[in-house]
Amino acid sequence: MRAAVDSVNKNPAGRAGYTSSSPNKQYDYDHRYDSAVYYDKAFRDRKLSVLKTAYEQYKKEAAEYAGPAVVETFGEDSFSPVNKEEAWSFTEKQQRLFLEYRNLSMPVVNQYIPGDETSFTIIAFPLPSIGPDFEEIFKETIDINTLDYVKYQKIQQHIIDALDRAEYVEVLGNGKNRTNLRIDLAELSDPASQTRFENCVADVNIPLGEVFTSPRLSGTEGLLHVGSVYISGIQFKDLTMEFKEGRVTSVSCGNFLEALPPLAGEQEKKEAAEAGRKLVVQEIMNQHETLPMGEFAIGTNTTAYAMAERFGITDRLPILIVEKMGPHFAVGDTCYSWSEDSPMYNPDGKEMTARDNEVSILRKEDVSRAYFGVHKDITIPYKELGSITVVEPGGTRVSIIKDGRFVLPGTEELNQALDR
């Protein structure tokens, strides 16, 4: 499927489908919301009606659809957008209608393409525009994409065993990184046969590796802060998110503050801060003012991290790779949206039972309140990470990562790439 270019079908959050790299990212940014010219309730209802008709007409083809096989690229220069007064934007009413359409369209798609009957696979390769080291970076990307999954699977099991004994996890930043998060975890009714974390190697997401869960929202709170992260084609600077009861309460980024002249006044700073907040809401949260924390994960691919640091390309890597290079947090839906009732088992035979949270479980009462159609990962790189600590019910503290290095027994081999 070719990526849409018309305003009727264009996704403001980015391109979906096969497409070339953009010749003008500022142009794309300026025209994200051109549909604001005509977006009203009549249009929303008509678009939903056409969607239903199209799926009914092609239901045989939809039933045979197994899911996407995606090849991403990376290496373009990082992009920091400039807000233009002339660019269209949604009014509050249009934003509400847009979100309502997303909520109403998701059950339609799931009716014809059930989430528990499809999968996906995704991989990324560098472009020559990444610089003079392209050939070497390409070779190392191949190495990263073909790491020994059995070795990582065993190492990650040590992390999961520690996490399954936790009441909650504490994540702290290091240096200028102000992250201070408490992540509450789902309860296990039978620890002998159940686990909270999926042992993820390279079965769908390439490269490997991570362990991830759907956090319990109640009790999950604190500040997430990242100095720089590349999401949806935009480099976010000094990104922050505050969480309370597992839900985003405030966001900010320094993209527009950084661009101000040294003698900017307070009003200019206030406007730049608000522009940064809106950028996060539009590009990361897909117009939602608040979202739950849908995922907490610990990435273990220190080889990818070492490569990125060696070539100085961390801010040009896609989130597909970056999410494996430290702990990451996704806002929006869980990793199991629309397939929560399908059992999932780790290689050790334990069932991964933390497939729901307090929001997704609402699907049993009102599906429109359970999903957001959003899942955006935000990673803290190892160098900005102070510690990840398991806190057990009795108060015992067990370190998984300290000062950017794996210290949990059984995981020390992951530090070899960092030492090189």
Task: Please state what every model-predicted region is.
Residues 1-218, 402-420:
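Active-site bordering "gate/hinge" segments
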